[in-house]
Amino acid sequence: MNWRIIAVLVSFLPVILLFIFSPVSVTDIFSVGIAPFIMAVLFSLAKVFLQAYRFKYFVDKFLGYKVSSSLQLISVRVGSEFVTNTTPSYIGGEIVRIAWLTKHKVPAGIAAWITTMEIIADVFVGTILALFAGIIALYNGAILIGTIIILISSFIFGFWLIVVILSAHYNIQLPKVITKLVRRFLSGERSDKIINYTNTAISDLCTMSRENFNSRRTIKIFFFGMVLTFFAFACLGASFLVLGSTIESDLGLYDSILATAASTELGSLPITVGGSGLTEIGLWAYVSGLNNVPSLNEVLKDSHLDVIISWRIASYHIPLMIMWIVLMRLTLIKKNYVEN
């Protein structure tokens, strides 16, 4: 459990450094008002719940039978989000969900298929919104931030599009570079077991792709998942809207959705834990219409900074605590089950 505690503490580091080295204080952060802050938290939790419901929906529809209760499936999705939000590039939660599904006798390939559909839904909706945000930023003269957003979004979208196309036509296996790294750091028997298990799961995933991508039923399921994903992003945008509107009366939901989608894309760079620091900078750069590299003093004195930090606490740190509690509950239930 130590890594989880460390991850939470590290995620707070950018906020702590901001309090130390800038004029921003705790009072400034909560000057947005208690009611808007609570509303921002609720919208952020709604986003998490919609993603959890999407997982439950995909599991029920793709399997065609109940693998567990709705509450348990939603709890697993929420708990796994803690792992997602405490690793670089928002990865790791998928492994938790695959492991949970396989322990409940779901074939590894089908479990990987379900989580891959979740990833694709998030990527497609998130990158499309971010691309719109980048184009609008360019149109408004914010060349630097617009270009950065478009480049990152295009790379992520292109990568996953290639994965989808390849998986639907070929059997993908682990690249030789990765297998060599695994064999270098793990013992022969253990590394072979991991590589064989992973390659089998990937092969099953490719088989599922070929069987399902031409199915109208699958397209309908995935389309509904995309709709849920869009509403999840809309909730994230609304969480910023209720705070941002306290200083900008002309801020609309459309602008807020694009701004938060753009900041999420920047936060997906594998640099910091859960995008901490990058997400805040990305949101600030977008709403400020960044067109050149700013000085540190310009960033620290910007009027948007208080609201952005308030939003980050409401949309990330508080939900993170709830995710941690849910994950601990799942871990304790599993431990008690094993002991009994």
Predicted regions and their residues:
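Short intracellular "coupling" helices and adjacent cytoplasmic loop segments at the cytosolic face
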Residues: K66, V78-I95, R190, V273
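Predominantly cytoplasmic-facing regulatory/coupling regions of multi-pass membrane proteins
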Residues: M1-V78, I136, L144-G267, V293-N340
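Re-entrant/interfacial helical elements at transmembrane boundaries that shape
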Residues: G92-T102, V273-G289
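Membrane-interface alpha-helices at helix entry/exit sites of multi-pass transporters
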Residues: S70-Q72, S89, G93, H104-I120, ...
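Transmembrane alpha-helix interface/packing and boundary motifs in multi-pass membrane proteins
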Residues: S80-P88, A261-E280
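Transmembrane-helix boundary and interhelical linker motifs in polytopic inner-membrane proteins
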Residues: V59-V67, I98-G109, W113
